[in-house]
Amino acid sequence: MQPRRIVLLGSTGSIGTQAIDVVDGAPHLFEVVALSAGGGNLELLARQAVHTKAKAVGTASGDATALQRLIDDAARATGVAGYRPEIITGPDASTRIAEIEADVVLNGITGSIGLAPTLAALKSGATLALANKESLIVGGALVKAAAREGQIVPVDSEHSAIAQCLRSGTAAEVDRLILTASGGPFRGRTREELHNVSPEEALAHPTWDMGLMVTTNSASLVNKGLEVIEAHLLFDIPLDRIDVVVHPQSVVHSMVQFVDGSIIAQASPPDMRLPIALGLGWPDRVPKAATPCDWTQATSWTFEPLDAEAFPAVNLAKDAAKQGSTYPAVFNAANEEAVMAFHAGRIRFTDIVDTIEAVLSEHPGSSGLTVESVLDAEAWARARTHERLAVSSL
């Protein structure tokens, strides 16, 4: 059997680097044929290209000559002579890389800029291993319409867990989806105690090692709100049948409750290589993708309800999803701008979600959902967020 041909989008990020680890561990199963990254770490991208011998490499920023020079340097350092991949540069590099013939496209890009590559991957006919939740959230019905049944395989640990649990019953037997949340670094704090937390504190996630945006979103629970929308879209479960429970140990990644009262949970130590491997190999599991739980050691798992007063982002995300159309895109764009303002020291931590709520309340909506209407709504939300924050800082 030939290895599956893999395209990695966002290869230098957390998901991308771990995906290469997965491929390295199962070279008989997977082969990387193309890579792309934003361009913030061209040296790493060059090393990855040489390591995987990808046929094509893309970068949103940086020129082809500079990248080829770095690839040549990396090739000499590792004794790989004459390696000359196709190099694609420019803002649409990841979209063009996603169009390359492959069996699986892993979209590990962060943010709504992943929408065009997601649509391109679906159009190509490849299976889409989706870690870029924002593209599904802002694209909504557009993305679902572009995908054939089963073409999108979730890579987020929570949604991968749900997909695994759903194998235990039919669609008609599903009662509720239960997403788990670690609670982030501020679990147990009141809203008043959250006012003056620092960016450094927000980035100190107790479980996962992620980038600035995702880590901050985990601290505010905006990330969990986005995941609720994602679960709603992926699994066609109404929003009022999707719950969030806090589970600090991050071992149970999500659960499915069935109509007979049974609950099926997926549990494993927190390691993104497991859902990445499953996304690449779906529906088959990859042997030894991650280390299992050690049942020779005493352990305890705890669960507690979400404090929606201290962390209103989940309910706010549900409201945006219920309004539909371009409201989820506005939610996401306003959050991204507010997070950057927080890290620039311009607003307080609690202002992030307050700003999202204010911008959502002013959004005029859209008569239909198209790529253009999504982009217009995002641009409006970013501009309106900047305007509000500029006024508040005066």
From Swiss-Prot:
Residues where Mn(2+) binds: 156, 158, 227
TM region(s), chain numbering: none
Pathway, per record: Isoprenoid biosynthesis; isopentenyl diphosphate biosynthesis via DXP pathway; isopentenyl diphosphate from 1-deoxy-D-xylulose 5-phosphate: step 1/6
Residues where NADPH binds: 12-15, 38, 41, 132, 134, 211
Domain of life: Bacteria
Protein's UniProt keywords contain Manganese: yes
Binding residues for 1-deoxy-D-xylulose 5-phosphate: 133, 157-158, 182, 205, 218, 223-224, 227
Reaction equations catalysed: 2-C-methyl-D-erythritol 4-phosphate + NADP(+) = 1-deoxy-D-xylulose 5-phosphate + NADPH + H(+)
UniProt keyword Protease, yes or no: no
GO terms classed as biological process: isopentenyl diphosphate biosynthetic process, methylerythritol 4-phosphate pathway involved in terpenoid biosynthetic process
CC cofactor: Mg(2+); Mn(2+)
Enzyme Commission identifier(s): 1.1.1.267
SUPFAM superfamilies hit by this protein: 1-deoxy-D-xylulose-5-phosphate reductoisomerase, C-terminal domain, Glyceraldehyde-3-phosphate dehydrogenase-like, C-terminal domain, NAD(P)-binding Rossmann-fold domains
Sample GO molecular function, one term: NADPH binding
Keywords associated with the record: Isoprene biosynthesis, Manganese, Metal-binding, NADP, Oxidoreductase
Purpose: Catalyzes the NADPH-dependent rearrangement and reduction of 1-deoxy-D-xylulose-5-phosphate (DXP) to 2-C-methyl-D-erythritol 4-phosphate (MEP).
PANTHER family according to UniProt: 1-DEOXY-D-XYLULOSE 5-PHOSPHATE REDUCTOISOMERASE, 1-DEOXY-D-XYLULOSE 5-PHOSPHATE REDUCTOISOMERASE, CHLOROPLASTIC
Cited HAMAP family: DXP_reductoisom
Assigned protein family: Belongs to the DXR family.
Name assigned to this protein: 1-deoxy-D-xylulose 5-phosphate reductoisomerase
The organism's taxonomic lineage, starting at the top: Bacteria, Bacillati, Actinomycetota, Actinomycetes, Micrococcales
